[in-house]
């Protein structure tokens, strides 16, 4: 059936779900119907930001240009941050874009829509912890990851120099939050520290001079995953010399330390906050229902109270069961994008929309425990049980998740070419970004 070229779809947010939706709709309906808005010029798969923070992934090599993707996949890309949504006029305002010198590259723009899809993601939730916003780094964006990487590299160089006059000098890193991001970052930092030491830091030894502490408020790390996965990850962290503190709630973050609710204090030359999410402040401007952490409340068909506004991913709360919500995970965003392709296509073609609600399917969880190990549970629950995997197999399967995302956007041949190019590049570059 023919498209209605006058039906304008604007997708705000080029994360995993938003980009997959734009790519699939663009291939079907073309750039005259589909526009993707994002505040950054490059796409990075967010689950890999912990590798960017450790320096084991170079965001400038791994990033995909939105303009390139728009050309390949048939959508229009608008660079800029979402400033406002005028629901009455059905228009979004995209903020101006400035260069590094503060000169304007693009002015503010208004983009009209018939269907608006919010895929804004989430930001870190500090839970009103004193000092956290001022002294802790997050992994919300590639800029955050790059800031942490540079700060970490500088701190290791300083410790290397300080060892000459003070043999006890060391770098203390505290990671708040024992979910997948916190666990993966802890292992990645440990491995990166050992690699960096081999590149011109003769006095620095990661096993001696890099102290990593993972702090988790729940009784165990990876509390949302099966206990067997949690135990395996805890064992791996302990074997690497990473200190794990569970049942430990952070009461305050200072410039060089954190204080816990039970009165303890941990040295923290660097503090990474990975302990929860919340919706972006902009969500409050929509004048629609939000949940307690600022996510837009949608129904099972991913519809907001405004029939022209849909949502997917971490920015919204999707009902699951009687009282639950769909977890904020990459696989959920992928599934929601696939659901919305059918729904939005029906709108563009003027046909009946599917009435069956979106149903989240848990295909399991994989956690990276370094460059050669992982742990996870596959296929959700088979006959009431998950299939436990660990070691190199789990790591290979974890890496395949990134390729699956690229495949959804780029297709088979381009994904294979990209994977080969990155493999060859890693043979000629250091394993950790050093500049």
For the regions a protein language model found, what residue spans apply to each?
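Conserved N-terminal Rossmann-fold NAD(P)-binding element of oxidoreductases
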Residues: 12-13, 118, 176-177
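FAD-site-proximal beta/loop scaffold in flavoenzymes
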Residues: 134-163, 256-259, 265-338, 342
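Rossmann-like NAD(P)H-binding beta-loop-alpha module
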Residues: 148-207
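A Rossmann-like FAD-binding core segment of flavoenzymes
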Residues: 31, 73, 77-96, 190-300, ...
């Amino acid at each position: 059936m023919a498209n209605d070229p006058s039906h304008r779809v604007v997708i705000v947010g080029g994360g995993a779900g938003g980009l997959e939706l734009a790519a699939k709709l663009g291939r079907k309906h073309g750039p005259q119907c589909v526009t993707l808005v994002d505040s950054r010029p490059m796409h990075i798969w967010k689950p890999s930001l912990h590798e960017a923070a450790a320096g084991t992934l170079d965001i400038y090599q791994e990033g995909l240009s939105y303009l390139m993707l728009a050309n390949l996949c048939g959508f229009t890309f608008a660079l800029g941050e979402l400033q406002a949504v005028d629901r009455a006029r059905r228009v979004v305002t995209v903020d101006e874009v400035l260069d590094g010198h503060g000169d304007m590259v693009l002015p503010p723009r208004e983009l009209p829509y018939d269907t608006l899809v919010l895929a804004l993601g989430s930001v870190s939730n500090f839970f009103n912890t004193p000092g956290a916003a001022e002294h802790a780094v997050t992994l919300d964006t590639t800029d955050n990851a790059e800031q942490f990487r540079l700060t970490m590299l500088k701190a290791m160089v300083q410790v290397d120099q300080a060892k000459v006059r003070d043999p006890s000098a060391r770098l203390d890193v505290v990671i708040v939050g024992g979910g997948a991001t916190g666990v993966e970052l802890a292992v990645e930092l440990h491995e990166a520290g050992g690699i960096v030491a081999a590149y011109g830091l003769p006095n620095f030894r990661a096993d001696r001079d890099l102290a990593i502490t993972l702090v988790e408020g729940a009784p165990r790390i990876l509390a949302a995953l099966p206990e067997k996965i949690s135990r395996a990850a805890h064992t791996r962290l302990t074997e690497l010399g990473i200190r794990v503190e569970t049942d430990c709630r952070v009461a305050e973050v200072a410039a060089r330390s954190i204080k816990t609710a039970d009165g303890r204090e941990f040295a923290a030359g660097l503090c990474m906050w990975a302990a929860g999410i919340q919706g972006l402040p902009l969500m409050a401007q929509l004048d629609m229902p939000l949940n307690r952490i600022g996510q837009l409340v949608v129904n099972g068909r991913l519809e907001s109270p405004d029939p022209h506004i849909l949502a997917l991913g971490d920015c919204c709360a999707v009902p699951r069961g009687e009282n639950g919500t769909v977890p904020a995970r990459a696989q959920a965003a992928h599934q929601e994008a696939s659901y919305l392709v059918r729904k939005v296509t029906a709108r563009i073609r003027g046909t009946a929309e599917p009435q069956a609600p979106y149903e989240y399917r848990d295909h399991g969880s994989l956690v990276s425990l370094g460059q050669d190990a992982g742990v996870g549970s596959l296929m959700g629950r088979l006959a009431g049980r998950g299939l436990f995997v660990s070691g190199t197999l789990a790591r290979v399967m974890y890496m395949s998740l990134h390729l699956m995302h690229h495949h959804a956007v780029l297709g088979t041949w381009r994904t294979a070419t990209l994977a080969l190019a990155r493999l060859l590049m890693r043979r000629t570059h250091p394993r950790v970004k050093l500049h």
